[in-house]
């Protein structure tokens, strides 16, 4: 039985009318299936005219907005949910029939892809931190070495956009990618079980999204559910919590120590730290644009995944320096004051901030100091893991936001402010040439900003503002 046979004449409900939900809508419509789209928001579209346009363009879709429709959900045979919807806290789980199939868009893609004569190959990446950097680096390497790759999932375009009606059943898609590089969040993994990836990696694990997953053990199990869905597991030797439940045919590891055969690591050669594949020297980390040991791990994870897919190791290594990183991830901010300003606004959890500090402190020279700006919405995280590093490696802590006071309590001399602009102004008064000011909040941005991107942009603007306009 093909996936389409299983979907025919079924009550299908798409939960959420955001980017993911609308990609599901377009795909189901292209297969000539009838379905409903349910969103608790009264108006998920930009305006009524846009909603009317969708209703006209997709006549087999029933749109129900303003609440989670009990009668619709309780009679569903198949529910396709958007990853941002918490089925438990929204009260949806209690409405779902016992035999209802609950999946996400990535699972739907995999069901379709698996049924094709020539399925698209997949590389999958998850983890608390660094996954966007790793998949973007993989995509950059693929382009440089001539591999036709698509970036999808939690980054890039919705994964169902890779499929089209006229070629779902064909052995080849029009402009079919050689490989799909998919970034997966824990929310997407909750509804994913049918992926057949060449290789997958859980980069690291730290407290995150515990407001939804409740316990670290549950979060860990969800993340590691990626491994049974891959032939090769790419695991970090630096983060045991990320690989305790590995179930794969083959394992390739990466870490900061000297590697074993067919694994990746670092070794000191002629007073330089060199990236190694077994006994083979690849490149000195000094030659790479992304600083810090956490980024060395990201580079090695990408190389291991690409190697798993059969890509030339020498060709990948030659092109590592061409990837300049992503905005808001340990991004250097240009300034005229000879202070090192680092925008790490994407550090929305404790683990990301720990990684940033641990990776950047070794780059400071002499008596140069590290000033950290942190705080925001911690989403119920335990900040105690920051205590040692804040007291040993951070010379001045500046906090703000909903949970700023809790972070400030971990040291004796923190400065607490109300706005990010004030935080930058305080840092400007303290920092001297050569010092580093790091925005790495260890928290989400939703208490003060629309998203982490806006937070990072406001940090950059405040850093680059002239002295007189900052007061």
From Swiss-Prot:
Subcellular location per UniProt equals: Cytoplasm
| E.C. number | 6.3.2.9
The protein's annotated pathway: Cell wall biogenesis; peptidoglycan biosynthesis
InterPro entries the record matches: Mur-like_cat_sf, Mur_ligase_C, Mur_ligase_C_dom_sf, Mur_ligase_cen, MurD
Query: What Gene Ontology molecular-function terms does this entry list?
Result: ATP binding; UDP-N-acetylmuramoylalanine-D-glutamate ligase activity
Its recorded reaction(s) are:
UDP-N-acetyl-alpha-D-muramoyl-L-alanine + D-glutamate + ATP = UDP-N-acetyl-alpha-D-muramoyl-L-alanyl-D-glutamate + ADP + phosphate + H(+)
- What does UniProt give as GO cellular component? cytoplasm
Residues the record lists as binding ATP: 127-133
Principal location: cytoplasm
**Cross-referenced Pfam families, in alphabetical order?**
Mur_ligase_C (PF02875), Mur_ligase_M (PF08245), MurD-like_N (PF21799)
- GO annotation, biological process: cell division; cell wall organization; peptidoglycan biosynthetic process; regulation of cell shape
Class of this enzyme: ligase
Q: Which UniProt keywords apply?
A: ATP-binding, Cell cycle, Cell division, Cell shape, Cell wall biogenesis/degradation, Cytoplasm, Ligase, Nucleotide-binding, Peptidoglycan synthesis
Which family does the UniProt entry place this protein in? Belongs to the MurCDEF family.
HAMAP family referenced in this protein's UniProt entry, alphabetically? MurD
Under the heading PANTHER family, the entry gives: UDP-N-ACETYLMURAMOYLALANINE--D-GLUTAMATE LIGASE
Q: Which NCBIfam families match?
A: murD
Q: What does this protein do?
A: Cell wall formation. Catalyzes the addition of glutamate to the nucleotide precursor UDP-N-acetylmuramoyl-L-alanine (UMA).
Can you name this protein? UDP-N-acetylmuramoylalanine--D-glutamate ligase
**Which species?**
Colwellia psychrerythraea (strain 34H / ATCC BAA-681)
Gene expressing this chain? murD
């Amino acid at each position: 039985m093909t996936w389409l046979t299983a979907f025919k004449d079924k009550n299908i409900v798409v939960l959420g009318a955001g980017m993911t939900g609308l990609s599901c809508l377009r795909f189901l419509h292209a297969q000539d299936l009838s379905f409903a789209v349910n969103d608790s928001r009264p108006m998920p579209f930009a305006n009524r005219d846009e909603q009317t346009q969708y209703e006209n363009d997709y006549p087999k879709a029933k749109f129900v907005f303003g609440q989670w429709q009990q009668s619709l959900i309780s009679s569903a045979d198949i529910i396709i949910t958007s990853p941002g919807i918490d089925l438990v806290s929204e009260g949806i789980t209690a409405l779902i029939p016992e035999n209802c199939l609950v999946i996400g868009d990535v699972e739907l893609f995999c069901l379709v892809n698996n049924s094709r004569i020539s399925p698209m190959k997949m590389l999958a990446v998850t983890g608390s931190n660094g996954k966007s950097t790793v998949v973007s680096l993989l995509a950059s390497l693929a382009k440089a070495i001539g591999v036709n790759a698509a970036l999808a999932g939690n980054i890039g375009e919705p994964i169902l956009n890779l499929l089209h009606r006229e070629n779902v059943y064909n052995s080849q898609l029009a402009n079919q990618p050689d490989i799909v590089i998919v970034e997966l969040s824990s929310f997407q993994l909750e509804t994913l079980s049918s992926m057949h990836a060449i290789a997958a990696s859980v980069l690291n694990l730290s407290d995150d999204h515990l407001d939804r997953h409740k316990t670290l053990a549950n979060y860990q199990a969800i993340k590691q559910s990626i491994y049974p869905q891959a032939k090769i597991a790419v695991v970090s030797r630096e983060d045991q919590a990320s690989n305790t439940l590995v179930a794969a045919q083959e394992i390739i590891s990466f870490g900061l120590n000297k590697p074993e055969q067919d694994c990746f690591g670092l070794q000191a050669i002629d007073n330089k730290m060199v990236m190694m594949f077994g006994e083979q020297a690849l490149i000195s980390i000094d030659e790479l644009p992304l600083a810090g040991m956490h980024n060395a791990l990201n580079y090695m994870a990408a190389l291991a995944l690409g190697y798993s897919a059969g890509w030339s190791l020498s060709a990948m290594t030659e092109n590592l320096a061409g990837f300049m990183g992503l905005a808001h991830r340990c991004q250097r901010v240009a300034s005229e004051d000879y202070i090192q300003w680092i925008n790490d606004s994407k550090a929305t959890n404790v683990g990301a901030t720990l990684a940033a500090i641990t990776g950047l402190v070794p780059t400071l020279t002499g008596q140069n100091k590290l000033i950290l700006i942190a705080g925001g919405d911690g989403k119920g995280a335990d900040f105690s893991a920051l205590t040692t590093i804040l007291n040993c490696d951070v010379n001045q802590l500046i906090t703000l936001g909903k949970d700023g006071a809790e972070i400030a309590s971990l040291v004796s001399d923190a400065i607490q402010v109300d706005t990010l602009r004030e935080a930058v102004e305080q840092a400007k008064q303290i920092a001297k040439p050569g010092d580093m000011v790091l925005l790495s909040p260890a928290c989400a941005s939703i208490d003060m900003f629309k998203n982490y991107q806006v937070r990072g942009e406001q940090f950059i603007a405040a850093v680059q503002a002239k002295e007189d306009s900052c007061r």
